[in-house]
């Protein structure tokens, strides 16, 4: 009899507890559903959030809450995370309001979505690069810079690019833009107006080596001076290449294929960097010994980008000395010829006079602190016209207006880099080429150790796009960020967590939102951060993101987008964000470059035959 009573009591207690638990869970579910439906962030437009599921562990006194991915679209900070947990706790019924709470979204707790730079406590080392610090010589160093950079982007290698470009439409057998013409432009042209004149110079002035897979020089003319001679063409007919030997150092052929321009127009698969030869000589410590000289016959006075090329040899030196003679004087560079061989290597953009001049040339000296060899191949002046034929015709446009696929071929990239679809789908190839060029250049470096390539240590990439979308009430569409974590088991090729890309995306969007709102006193819209499968965020071996800056289809966005002041603000915000991200990744302090001076003037000096320069410094209200 007693056993029956005990059993009845136990069963009654069990079912009572279960009933109470079910009642609590039903109550919690209703409250959480209401909470997440109403959850918004005043400055961020990420769409409606919802409760996916939850689980209460009464024994461990824990509540696991799983919200929809919209919660991961918003930025998370220590304060906002604490506030979210506090508000959830306030709405929960007793006794579970005293339980430990964990909120998940997109497979992570919201605490894990706080970028390292904004964390007050423990950092996520799996996203940091503190143990991945390139200790070699940078690809290109501007020796003539009148100051040294110590807390900027010195020694860092960064890939950034503008979106799209003219491409060959395979099924229509014609060339066309990838995006429609709207508000006096197309995205293929529009995003260049931020990247080329603003962002890239800002990054380079901070000390970075910057690569962009599309042609960066807007100069329509192009002159190539090569040891294999010059192709007869309208421009550059009087150009010449010269070698001077020393007693100890003779110039000789490397015995490996190098660059040569054998034709005016190139077909799919042609590789100009396999059509010629290259030269080399031993290095010496003394100045003015052996050297090679490239003298262009410039067709028209103007600014020309200068690109050099060489081959990587077993005993190449990391301090090959190049001198660029131009209208502004002589600029000296040091190029690390142990990496980045067999392609065009950008030195800088300079003004050259028409014709052939003693003050217009490039010189490679064999002077070096290292024992080894320097290599000489072609030098290119100017961006030039597109010379890749598709369907029997070229684009007819300057190269800088074309997509990356065609620049990649002219730059000597392997066919697999720019033609994964074997010439049958140029638009897909163009999208993939941007990332694959970075991977190939970085292959074998500490940031891409698993792929073969040219060893240049690129550590991040950013693609700038504009988006579609219309607001009928002239509100701003604003900025969207994109990154990808669901690839390669969630890791970069270094083994680091791909959520480093989310950190990069968040920092960029945060800086853009802050600077645009503060400068123009407008409610600039910060949209979502999408964790989705896009080529430009999936394929790069390094941390990568897409910034969809604004809508090229919306009047309110484009009213600002065409303003040069706005372009400067955006460029500077992107530069500052990249500076913050990379410095944090390596645990380094940083200083933001000051604004350009104003009120610059030249006056006659008090003394005879003298001039005085004057200017005013500019305070930066955003720093």
Task: List where the protein language model places each region.
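Active-site microenvironments of hydrolase-like enzyme catalytic domains
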Residues: 161, 401-498, 530-553
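A short beta-strand element within beta-rich, extracytoplasmic domains
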Residues: 278-280, 290-314
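N-proximal, solvent-exposed amphipathic alpha-helical segments enriched in charged/polar residues
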Residues: 22-60, 136
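Extracellular carbohydrate recognition and processing domains
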Residues: 327-357
